[in-house]
């Protein structure tokens, strides 16, 4: 606990809040071009082949972003929309690619949580 005199001399340091997705630069989404599409393995104790893409954003940042859902049609030079949001078991992946916008199609035959995966409403029979 500082004395009054110490506070007069030094003052309190204000804690600066660090962004969790700095490449977005306070935008909700950013457009980018895929430079590499590949799979990577998660941290212990999980095991899988997670689909990720390296994306060069319009503001010049190059980020690794996650491709959610089952199956995708991305390849190099695909134009995608990137949003914030990390993947807990993939170190360095702090962004998600938005399904169903620009070059990335929505998940096929998706019935539940469709809006998160850009899937159209199935035809009622």
UniProtKB/Swiss-Prot annotation:
One of the entry's Gene Ontology molecular-function terms is: structural constituent of ribosome
**Compositionally skewed regions (Basic residues) per UniProt:** 113-125
Known Pfam families for this protein? Ribosom_S12_S23 (PF00164)
Q: Which NCBIfam families match?
A: rpsL_bact
What does the record give as the function of this protein? With S4 and S5 plays an important role in translational accuracy.
Family per similarity comment: Belongs to the universal ribosomal protein uS12 family.
Q: What is this protein called?
A: Small ribosomal subunit protein uS12
Q: Which gene encodes it?
A: rpsL
């Amino acid at each position: 606990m500082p004395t009054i005199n110490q506070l007069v001399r030094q003052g309190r340091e204000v804690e600066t809040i660090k962004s969790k997705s700095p490449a977005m630069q306070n935008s909700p989404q950013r457009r980018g071009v895929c430079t590499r599409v590949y799979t990577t393995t998660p941290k212990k104790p999980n095991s899988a082949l997670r689909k990720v893409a390296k994306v060069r954003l319009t503001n010049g940042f190059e980020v690794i972003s996650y491709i959610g859902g089952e199956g995708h049609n991305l390849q190099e030079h695909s134009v995608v929309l990137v949003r914030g949001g990390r993947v807990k078991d993939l170190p360095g992946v702090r962004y998600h690619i938005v399904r169903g916008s620009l070059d990335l199609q929505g998940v096929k035959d998706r019935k539940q949580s469709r809006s998160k995966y850009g899937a159209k409403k199935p035809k009622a029979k």
